[in-house]
């Protein structure tokens, strides 16, 4: 299985971008669970390996079948115990903290609506009873440009 996690410090969410993705497109942090590792430990390890951030309060959110490589993606939310980003892994070209306002303004490209990554971002975005992310008119959608 693989884990995918939305890391937040309350006011900001940590999103990453791979070099192969178009500029401005970001997603949540993900990685594979190692043999003998709990899902929660995989979240802590992957986040630290890829971003240098330490997380706590790891909470299961939902899952989604993942066609590559025929796996199951298990989604989590986690609180950032530290916020300094150090890209320690070649998987990400960039990682950055983003605000709800940046998402609403369309400054950050997000994944497709049906992806687990989008659902995790939306869960955090809507945590304080704001309008759901999918209804924001200027949000830049992953792969579809500005709406």
Stretches with model-predicted labels:
Residues 1-28, 32, 54-57, 78-80:
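N-terminal strand-loop-strand
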Residues 13, 21, 66-68, 103:
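Surface-exposed, flexible loop/turn segments at secondary-structure boundaries
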Residues 64-89:
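Active-site-adjacent beta-strand/loop module that shapes the phosphate/pyrophosphate-binding cleft
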Residues 22-26, 88-147:
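Nudix hydrolase/Nudix homology domain
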Residues 10, 81-83, 100-103:
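Generic structural motif
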Residues 28-62, 76, 84:
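The catalytic Nudix box helix
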């Amino acid at each position: 299985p693989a884990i995918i996690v939305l890391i937040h410090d309350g006011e900001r969410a940590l999103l990453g971008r791979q070099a192969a993705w178009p500029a401005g497109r970001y997603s949540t942090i993900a990685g594979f669970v190692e043999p003998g590792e709990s899902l929660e430990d995989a979240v802590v390890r992957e986040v630290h390996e890829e971003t240098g951030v330490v997380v706590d309060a790891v909470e299961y959110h939902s899952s989604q079948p993942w066609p590559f490589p025929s796996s199951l993606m298990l989604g989590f939310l986690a609180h950032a115990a530290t916020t300094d980003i150090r890209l320690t892994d070649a998987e990400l070209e960039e990682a950055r903290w983003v605000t709800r306002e940046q998402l609403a303004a369309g400054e950050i490209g997000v994944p497709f609506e049906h992806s687990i990554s989008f659902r995790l971002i939306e869960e955090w975005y809507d945590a304080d009873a704001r309008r759901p992310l999918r209804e924001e008119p200027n949000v830049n959608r992953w792969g579809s440009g500005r709406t």
